[in-house]
Amino acid sequence: MQTFKTLTMKKSLFIGALIAMAGLSFQSCEKLSSINENPNEPSNVDAGVLFTEGVRSSVSTSVTQSYLLGNVASQLAAKTLRAVIGEYSWNAFPNTWNQNYASLGNIIEAERVAAEAGNAQMEGAAKVMKSWVFSTLTLAYGDIPYTEAITGSTDAEWFPAYDTQEEIITGTNGLLEELARAVQLLDNGGSIQGDILFNGDAAKWKKLANAMRLRLLMYISEKQNVSAEFAAIVASESLMESNADNGILTYTGNFPNEYPLVPLKQGDFDAVAISTNAHAALDSLNDPRMYVYARPNNASTVFADPSIPATYDGADNGSTAISASCDKNGSRLGYAYYNYPGHDQAGTMAEGIIMTYAEQQFLLAEAAHNGWITDDAGTHHASGVQASLEYYGADFGMTGWTDFADYIANSGAGYDNSINSIREQKWLAMFFTGLDNYFEVRRWYTQESGNWANLPFISAPCSNTNGDVLPMRFLYPGNEASLNPDNYFNAIVVMGGNTQNTKMWVVDL
């Protein structure tokens, strides 16, 4: 992979934007290195150009991560080939590390340029994106370069120390503090240039920042008492009010704003199917999201004659290379995610999800269930379910429901005073939500002390190689040992190892 000197720092912070402006693309570490050394490159790039490229690249990375990793690790989908995720034979997944740090280069430089120009709103929006990308990295790997990745001092530029996950999330200048600062900045003057997410709407950026704060607080709630801080945000800060506030990137269908899965060959795209567990959950609820998440097994027949009922099934998580008992014949992913012959809407309709109103509502439902806030858990839960169904354009008529009220009252999707009723609907709503669907499943699994039976909507993958234990993290990329050896090996000592079962701070209960 690329030798990006572990991180994208001051000298190369704006390389992604420069390449985009030149009509080039990220192809190799050698190309990046040669550009980094170009003495004729401009010393200043417009913050809006940097921000556009940082948002686009980070969201597109998130889409790809969810397709290959998050959906599968959370058991919403299953790999039918090269099933290392489902069989629990995890590695570094270096693209997650490399591409996220590359995106951070543009985002951090946009933040710096905006701060120097006194553009508070631009700086605030960049902080939101920076916090989101760093949260993905630390929740995937554990301890990572953070403080020195931000400062970009001469030594740290090439050999950044690893911060502990606790410091990254909760410390001074940590993610929670940065998001709080972002909210304050977004209340001030300036403008958000190059904003392909919210078209310069600072109020929407504030709502996203506050929703992210709730998400992070929930992730660390087994390590710290976060109830008061969570309640204070709910009581006094602006939050998402509907799907109109969703943190999503809409693609145009044309390069470079093309949904990242569209260029795949169909055979490669079809190596992922809806999972047995997701199919079972949707089928038992008679849930119309089935028709969005999955493509019918008899798609060609249904396409020719829509009166013929569509049929669906799921593929098992696990490996057929170990045991033939793993069924890999599930329905492939739906038309919304790929331009199948005769169905080319993915190019212009697919979106990259950072965070949705539905997820926020499930966070509020869980907080109410826990007694952190005085709101009604069932109301927030129903709002989350409805928001997810509406986002995916649910057609209740296709499944026999009169409307949402009929569905929520009679399908079994409603809140039944149990935490699992919230968990299951949140899980179904987080399809293609980066790696956060896996982070949530990992949190629930840890809360239940690794007892799969206490999470009835998922299960240990068949023929897995890890003793039915859900992996806790991705391994550090192998080239870290040669690029940043002292800090890399020190991080492994502090973390207690570099295996898929090493417990990072948030899950070390």
Feature map (PLM): residue ranges:
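Bacterial Sec-dependent N-terminal signal peptides
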Residues: 1-37
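Short acidic (Asp/Glu) and glycine-rich catalytic loops that position anionic groups and cofactors
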Residues: 30-33, 341, 399-404
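Residues in and immediately flanking transmembrane alpha helices
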Residues: 23-24, 300, 453
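Structured, solvent-exposed acidic/aromatic patches
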Residues: 45-48, 75-129, 133-394, 415-419, ...
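C-terminal functional modules
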Residues: 389, 393-509
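Membrane-proximal, proline-rich intrinsically disordered regions
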Residues: 29-80, 84-91, 98, 109, ...
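Short capping/connector residues at structural and topological boundaries
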Residues: 37-40, 149-151, 245, 295, ...
